């Protein structure tokens, strides 16, 4: 999944990027941070956010189904790695409200919302929406 960090860092060179639904997998966020990106991870699970903070990653508890828009202020992009299918439409809705790019790496077989473009990067299917 490090490839996801590569393409995001290549396309969004600076500024704040937010990973939504981070869980306990921090490799993409760590790689983006190493690239000089201001990374923020978000999850509804407080334990996941505490884990991220212990790893030196900024994290905030939030619910994608009722997002606190102030958290995403000044974000240049949002992304999600293998989000649950029911999260995909709210992710796209948030990106549209914020008018920023959205990157989703779905689980194999999951359908992404209409209007997202497939980027096949080093064998990883990454779906992107941009305003």
UniProtKB/Swiss-Prot annotation:
Superkingdom of origin organism: Archaea
Pfam family, one: UPF0146
SUPFAM superfamilies: S-adenosyl-L-methionine-dependent methyltransferases (SSF53335)
Family according to the record: Belongs to the UPF0146 family.
Name by which UniProt lists this protein: UPF0146 protein PH0209
């Amino acid at each position: 999944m490090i490839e996801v960090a590569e393409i995001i860092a290549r396309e969004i060179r600076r500024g704040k990027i937010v990973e939504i639904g981070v869980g306990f997998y921090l490799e993409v966020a760590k790689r983006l941070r190493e690239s000089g990106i201001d990374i923020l991870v978000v999850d509804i699970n407080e334990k996941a956010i505490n884990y991220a903070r212990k790893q030196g990653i900024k994290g905030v508890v939030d619910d994608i189904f009722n997002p606190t828009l102030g958290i995403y202020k000044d974000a240049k992009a949002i992304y999600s790695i293998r989000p649950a299918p029911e999260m995909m439409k709210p992710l796209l809705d948030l990106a549209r409200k914020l008018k920023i790019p959205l990157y989703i790496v779905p689980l194999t077989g999951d359908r992404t919302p209409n209007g997202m473009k497939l980027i096949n990067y080093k064998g990883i299917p990454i779906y992107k929406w941009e305003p």
